Amino acid sequence: MTEFFKNINKIQFEGTDAINPLAFRHYDAERMILGKSMKEHLRFAACYWHNFCWPGSDVFGAATFDRPWLQSGNAMEMAHMKADAAFDFFSKLGVPYYCFHDTDIAPEGTSLKEYVNNFAQMVDVLEQKQDETGLKLLWGTANAFSNPRYMSGAGTNPDPKVFAYAATQIFNAMGATQRLGGENYVLWGGREGYETLLNTDLRQEREQLGRLMQMVVEHKHKIGFKGTILIEPKPQEPTKHQYDYDTATVYGFLKQFGLENEIKVNIEANHATLAGHSFQHEIATATSLGLFGSIDANRGDPQLGWDTDQFPNSVEENTLVMYEILKAGGFTTGGFNFDSHVRRPSIDAEDLFYGHIGGMDTMALALERAANMIENDVLSKNIAQRYAGWNEDLGKKILSGDHSLETLAKFALDSNIAPVKESGRQEHLENIVNGFIYK
């Protein structure tokens, strides 16, 4: 293993009185809640890209991180060093899972054949690392957005040769994900959108993207991949408008191409807020549509209009997130992947741990609070009472199709219907939720 984290020991749970900044105060992996351990409920993962590929640069300035695996040198040697550092970090942090893009773990090289060869070599390395550490792969994916060839999209590119190049990456990344025991495969369409309608054929691009998704599903079944295929919605950035805008938009897209029973969503908190939604809204929408798959845990800055990918730190926000997840039965193949990165001036090795520890403690405390809400589920009782009329004779006949518009109008007139207003009691329910969060 690398020496980069040599002065950091494995992170332990030390309880709420802990003064050690490199310790968990709330995340006790084996603590039982609602019949499962915290580890089983939360299924934490750390990502390769933000932690080991981003050099700390931004559009206004150069890299700030002094990472040995990001220095100039033989690209494959740097990839091996990066893998050493990554698995050392994952192991010391104590997450059970990790996630990667294909080009996170291996250099692209100068040709498609070189990419395939480099990637295959590094998959061998990751397989060995998993055997040595016991770490598992939550999901893999292909980076079909960073290389300049994808400046006008991958699946939606006007050039079918670019489409074919992206398909080759996806083919290899899916095979690697299956080989490494990955529980999901993610599709994020970072460039699947447009900058201007002046040069865009919307129908053509939707057909292309739909066909790519169909090919992915066909290949999943051909190779016998047992994991879940996930789409990660995002409204914009890097493109002006992306076709996977939000969960509801994704559902409409999947229905159009007959994929609504084949693909679920990987919801990111910051993407939800960029789309004008709350994190809770996107999860509730996904569970109501049968699309809930996995989570990219992070947060945005409400004063900024872009994807800041900060670590989650709001127990209040994430209690409601955990409540929706628990109410829906919890994760199956998904989990909480920290698609989060330290700030550009946070240059020390310890900073990577501080960010994840804070995020893991936040989600653990949110889980605890949400479990209390489930055990004393006042919200569900209020909702059931509010919609009780739909379980009575009139409501049942409307939904079953026993009433047409004409017969329902006749019934209303004959019965002299006079609905009585009832309070939504929002403020009361908000106070109840606060009682659980701040007890």
UniProtKB/Swiss-Prot annotation:
Binds 2 magnesium ions per subunit. Its EC number is 5.3.1.5. The active site is at residues 101, 104. Its main location: cytoplasm. Mg(2+) 2 binds at residues 268, 271, 307, 309. It catalyses: alpha-D-xylose = alpha-D-xylulofuranose. Mg(2+) 1 binds at residues 232, 268, 296, 339. One of its GO terms (molecular function) is magnesium ion binding. This is Xylose isomerase. The gene is xylA.
